[in-house]
Amino acid sequence: MSVESHPQLTIRQAQHRVDTFLKAKGEEWTRLSNHHLRVTHLVEEVGELARAVINLDASYSDPNRRGASQPRGEKVAHLQDSLGDIFYHLLAISLAYGVDLGDAFEASMQNILARYPVRTPDEALNSEP
């Protein structure tokens, strides 16, 4: 299966693509993949992401662990698949509740920056410990 590349795809464009897909699949698809099931799928994908990260992390280099002998490129591909699946489910859930994921991300970044301000090197040098 070929995946078309979308350089510089915005979150809104991604939401639109998922919305178009879900509408094209119709009511039966929506009924069979309700929001509660979608959250369950999201949790499952987060578990797969955790396994992909552990597989890539050199500190977990147990040669007897499943997937340890897999080439790095395959491990990165698994990570990419997991991230893509998570993003799809986040987009679908956000659409179901009318949440703009871009706006949600910006609000989260503002909260993170308020809690953990980024200092320039000059500010760091001139501040007291």
Language-model region placement:
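Flexible "arm" and connector segments at domain edges
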Residues: 1-83, 87-129
